[in-house]
Amino acid sequence: MDQMKIGGFIALCRKEKGWTQSQLAEILGITDKAVSKWETGKSLPDYALLTPLSEALGITLSELCTPDMGDN
């Protein structure tokens, strides 16, 4: 999994919802700093958060783990 690509995709999906990092963090019960780390490619979401994150963003697990952002 490409951390930078996944992080960018999380940020894109979050912004499409009109949410701040803090709002997404609150939905998931985590800190906004964790969301920031994902979006900057410094870390990946914990395995236990993948399903809640994909559901919150309205995407599939497959889309989350292998984002196609049109750069192929």
PLM regions with names:
Residues 40:
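Short, conserved catalytic or interaction motifs in soluble domains
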